[in-house]
A protein has these predicted regions:
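Cofactor- and metal-binding active-site motifs of prokaryotic enzymes
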Residues: 1-139
């Protein structure tokens, strides 16, 4: 497995996501999984539109928050990307709605979607929205 990490605090959303992605993918190669972390100071649609064509067949997961905690600072503006690549990496993703109103249902639907991928074991990352309080019920 190869891992690439990239970060940018460029003012423009498209420039920031491109810089972060290129720094990450130059180390990892074509990603099977891309983790995207952004701050709320950016146009999230522009970030998404810019990034999606570049991840190829890989999957995307992540979230937007008020800051990104780095090794030496907390960044109130930035885009962080972690890319994972390797022939042995298999990725499935599931995006669920209504976590707050139906946490058990959201968890069940996510589990069913992940099981339908055919993978028998793996690691699950959960990125709920910041306003959800029922994450334990979902899990």
């Amino acid at each position: 497995m190869k891992v690439g990490i990239g970060f940018s605090d460029a003012r423009n959303a498209e420039d920031a996501v491109l810089e972060a992605f290129l720094n990450a993918v130059n180390v990892s190669g074509e990603p099977a999984m891309t983790f995207l972390f952004t701050t709320d100071s950016y146009d999230q649609e522009a970030i998404y539109r810019t990034l999606m064509p570049r991840i190829g067949k890989g999957r995307l997961g992540g979230f937007c928050g008020g800051g990104i905690i780095g090794r030496s600072a907390v960044h109130i503006q930035g885009v962080g990307i972690c890319t994972l690549s390797g022939d042995e990496i298999k990725v499935a993703t599931s995006l669920q709605k209504n976590l707050s109103s139906d946490p058990e249902g959201a968890g069940r639907r996510a589990g069913e979607a992940l099981l339908a991928s055919g993978m028998e074991s793996g690691t699950v990352f959960v990125f709920p929205d910041g306003f959800s309080t029922d994450v334990p019920e979902m899990i």
